[in-house]
């Protein structure tokens, strides 16, 4: 077998080419020409062929597609067609048992909805700047019926009423909150527990056990002791089911029904409350009635919160249900994020009536009373 020829490297070939080039200079004794300016070392990198550049697969900037009028119209029609709802019914799943048809229909509708959403997203990417704007989701709150009593912050009449109403001394810092908490006669342990939870949330509050004493008598005693607010917790079937808010000394008085009560110990994760004055957040009280209720709730808490405690008490109104939450916010590293730790309790209030002045069941003047069958004729009608 013939011996294999050794492959020469690029460096060796460049050296041979360099020696074979004609150079000018004197010839030495051995017959070799001497170059005048021969370099000591040969740089082979100069004679190497240039390396091929790698093709870039991922482009940093996406090229904008130039859409013709016909293509644009076709994509827009396709986008609108993808909004159509599915036409599948239970009759399409007759081959399944009756107990499984409902779940199968929901599963198919959900799958079809996801597919149409993905199709619309793809069309929006193709359209680019020509894509139509996303529609705002329709909710009961966004479709709320018009109410003539909606409060405008720049309304002079509202400002005049607030400057002369029963809560003006509190907002003018003429008085500081002092709250009395009591309950119905012969209250059970659960009601007492709820009163202690309220005392934990409301600073400067005191609990008084109530025996067979009339509520009017309690109001007069609270005035003599210079209390600014009175809370009376009612119970039904050994559980709290309502609460009376009475602002002293001139009222007004409101009655709320209590729903979805969860004590602190029943929460999955909770923290210990501190004695710092909390911040108060009042959300979504938009009408004149809602504005008065919000001012009544604000009067329960001191004016200047202590931000070092990071306590927050929230009254969030949604569809005339007032959700109560008690949190402490905690900052994460570098202060870029914050987390909420619930301190409890958790409950929901529903306004039943509002009475002018202090509580008077016989001769009291009611400003507003909830009559469900007469007033709740539409799901989109709210009063707070």
Curated annotation (Swiss-Prot):
Extent of the signal sequence: none
GO biological process: maturation of 5.8S rRNA; maturation of LSU-rRNA
Annotated Gene3D superfamilies: Probable brix-domain ribosomal biogenesis protein
Disulfide bonds: none
Annotated segments matching region Disordered: 1-58, 82-135
InterPro entries, per database record: Brix, IMP4/RPF1
Pfam families, sorted: Brix
Bias-annotated ranges (Basic and acidic residues): 115-127
MF terms (GO), sorted A to Z: rRNA primary transcript binding
Biased segments, Basic residues type: 96-114
Cellular component annotations (GO), alphabetically ordered: nucleolus; preribosome, large subunit precursor
Brix domain mapped to chain residues: 177-360
Biased composition range(s): Acidic residues: 18-48
Protein name according to UniProt: Brix domain-containing protein F44G4.1
Species classification: Eukaryota, Metazoa, Ecdysozoa, Nematoda, Chromadorea
